[in-house]
Structure formats: structure tokens, C-alpha cells
Design a protein with these regions (language model features):
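A short alpha-helical cap/connector motif
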Residues: 1-90, 96-137
């Protein structure tokens, strides 16, 4: 997942499209989420993290601020979508299996393509469950 380190660059985009919700898959250590929360640009924050230990750390790091979901994004994205309104949303999507980033595993250690490279499934779930015409992905 690419790190968001310059929320000022997002400001014009967020204001132009009246973005209210921020959804991140593959939240990892939460560094990007921290930048987003502190930016004050969004009203609602949602993050999906596969690794249970990292998920627990995220919940402790952002109590009562971010709604976190623990599991594969293909399983948790429907839950996220059920918990956001139809306001314009910025989806910051992960595009790979996190094993090599955090667990020292090879990218090909996960044989299920939908888990190893979740981006296509995430896009499908989002587009089938909401009007994406006002969202940014």
C-alpha cells in the first residue's frame, strides 16, 4: 500500500468532490490512516487489515475514531459498505497480499489470487454495491 504522506495534495480533490468517507484496505501499521485522520478532511474513516496483531494495534491506536475490520478485504468490504452512507467516498485500495511486507512471506505464498491480489475483487464488490459515480478510487 502506498503511504499517504501529503494530505494537502488531497485537499482540493476532497473539497471539489465533497468527499466525506475514507476507506482503506490493507491499513497495515496505520501510518497513512494517521495522516488522513489528522488532516481533518474526512468525516468517517474505515480500515481493513488482515493481520490480527496489526488489527489489534490499530484498534488501540485509533480508539473511537476509525472503524476497523479484521480479515480479507473480499470478505470485509461488504461490511464496510454496509456501514457507510452514500456520501462521496475515497477508496484507498491495497493491491497485494501483505505477507511479504509484514510477515516475511513471498508474494506467491498465497495461492488464492483473490487473496494475493485483492484489487480486482475489491473493485467488483464496490461497483456492484454502490453508485460509484461520485466516489474516488
Amino acid at each position: 500500500m502506498g503511504l499517504i504522506s501529503h494530505p494537502v495534495k488531497l485537499k482540493n480533490l476532497v473539497e471539489q468532490y465533497n468527499i466525506k468517507n475514507f476507506v482503506e484496505s490493507g491499513t497495515g501499521s496505520g501510518d497513512s490512516m494517521k495522516v488522513i485522520v489528522e488532516s481533518g478532511l474526512f468525516d468517517n474513516f474505515h480500515g481493513i487489515e488482515l493481520d490480527e496483531e496489526m488489527y489489534d494495534d490499530l484498534v488501540d491506536r485509533f480508539p473511537d475514531v476509525v472503524n476497523f475490520y479484521n480479515g480479507y478485504s473480499k470478505d470485509e468490504m461488504p461490511n464496510v459498505l454496509n456501514n457507510i452512507d452514500d456520501s462521496p467516498t475515497l477508496f484507498w485500495l491495497d493491491a497485494h497480499f501483505p505477507g511479504s511486507d509484514y510477515q516475511g512471506l513471498a508474494y506467491d505464498s498465497e495461492k488464492d489470487d483473490e487473496k494475493r491480489i485483492p484489487l480486482q475483487v475489491e473493485l467488483k464488490i464496490i461497483s456492484e454495491n454502490r453508485d460509484i459515480s461520485k466516489d474516488i478510487i
